[in-house]
A protein has these predicted regions:
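GHKL/Bergerat-fold ATPase module in large chromosome/replication-associated machines
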Residues: 233-237, 252, 271-278, 306
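RNase H-like, metal-dependent nuclease domains and their acidic two-metal-ion catalytic environment used
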Residues: 38-224, 257, 261, 274-386
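Extended oligomerization regions of viral-like shell subunits
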Residues: 232-238, 268, 283-287
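Short mixed-charge
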Residues: 7-18, 210-242
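Hydrophobic transmembrane alpha-helix bundles
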Residues: 31-38, 97, 226-231
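Conserved P-loop NTPase catalytic core
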Residues: 1-83, 241-260, 265-269
């Protein structure tokens, strides 16, 4: 529906000499519905609480989704990547305990996505700790779950889940990340190896007890040595049984430039795909599922959340503008905005491009077993450098 409105809007200004392209839009925001008693003020307040900012502006204020002046990513570019219907969902507490039953079939769980033979799964995380205030809007911690499926000498990326946290202590963020790592059957974790990222890496480097699930997750460590800082982060972990699964992204002007260009290339080439917008997903997918139809309000909000995050990431990306005064690409968010969702997405894509895909394009045949030795320790996949 939104694409139809946008096209009609364009036709209003481009159809003067072509009557077949005539178009007209009449828009009325929520105030008119209140004035005529179609909706009450209380109903509008409730509707706003249930919407993300982007949906509220589009559906109730009739504001078109626009971008920043000098934007690096256009609406159409990112909107064309929103093609995935099915989202991944982490296990609820009830689902987790059900999964321990002898006759449990995980393929029947809503939100389960089977892992393909050549598939690699990545969790990419941009970390923040401070809470936003009325005077300053801080970034959220954002985690993206990305599937990378091999096709010839490239990987097709599918971002199937996102979640965000604000003002959460690092020790709790380590728990959330490890829990999601095993729920998603992930292979790698990508995160910023500076500032708060260092504290998080230190927390991940020790076993983590999950009181809700009554289980302990193993230690995890940084494996990459492409910068001295990354190597130092790997050396901080003293647990000999730690899983070597963390890629520490050490930002620099050059590395950020590569990250931005990699992200744009993945979108332009169609390699990067993400979830449909929330409005489309509800119409085309969720409203046809019994899990959504018979869910209460809280559960419906949980099921819609990944699609809302897809919209929020789009809105964030089209609000980024390029600093034209610098030779290397630098992206700036507006004064009232953030870019945590974009950074989480772009770091994950950077890892796939510069770590996974480069192995495929080498002349020699790349074999993961040549780089890592895998065994089972305590029921978990154990990976370490040799």
């Amino acid at each position: 529906m939104w694409n139809l409105i946008r096209q009609t809007f364009k036709n209003m200004y481009s159809s003067r000499n072509d009557e077949s392209m005539n178009g007209m839009i009449i828009c009325a925001d929520y105030e008119l519905t209140i004035h005529h008693g179609i909706k009450t003020k209380k109903q509008m307040i409730k509707a706003k609480k249930q919407c993300d900012d982007m949906t509220w502006e589009m559906e109730y204020l009739n504001l078109m989704s626009g971008g920043a002046e000098g934007q690096y990513y256009t609406y159409d570019l990112i909107n064309h990547s929103q093609v995935l219907k099915k989202a991944f969902y982490p296990l609820t507490l009830e689902e987790y305990y059900n999964s321990k039953q002898p006759n449990y079939n995980k393929t029947e769980r809503f939100g389960y996505i089977p892992k393909e033979e050549d598939e690699v799964r990545i969790l990419s995380m941009d970390i923040a700790v401070a809470k936003s205030t009325s005077k300053k809007k801080n970034d959220f911690t954002d985690i993206k779950a990305i599937r990378a499926t091999r096709k010839d000498d490239i990987y097709i990326r599918q971002e199937v889940y996102s979640e965000g946290h604000e003002g959460v202590p690092v020790i709790e963020q380590a728990l959330y990340l490890k829990r999601l790592y095993f729920d998603f059957e992930a292979d790698w974790i990508v995160l910023d190896g500076r500032t708060y990222g260092i504290d998080l890496i230190d927390q991940l480097a020790r076993p983590t007890y999950d009181a809700e699930r009554e289980t302990t997750y193993p230690a995890m460590k940084v494996f990459n040595e492409d910068t001295p800082s990354a190597k130092d982060l790997g050396d901080r972990c003293k647990d000999p049984n730690a899983i070597a699964c963390i890629y520490a992204f050490i930002a620099s002007n050059e590395r950020n430039h590569i990250m931005h260009t990699n992200m744009k290339d993945a979108l332009l080439s169609g390699k990067f795909k993400c979830l449909k917008s929330n409005l489309v997903a509800k119409d085309e997918y969720l409203r046809g599922r019994k899990e959504y139809i018979f869910a209460d309000g809280r559960e419906k909000a949980r099921l819609e959340a990944p699609y809302i995050y897809s919209d929020m990431t789009l809105n964030e990306m089209i609000s980024l503008s390029r600093d034209e005064t610098k030779a290397m690409i630098t992206l700036k968010e507006p004064n009232t905005g953030t870019k945590d969702k974009y950074i989480a997405r772009a770091m994950g894509n950077y890892f796939i491009t510069n770590f996974l895909e480069t192995k495929l394009t080498k002349k020699e045949n790349y074999n993961m077993d040549d780089w890592y030795k895998v065994s089972l320790v305590g029921g978990y996949k154990q990976t370490f450098r040799i």
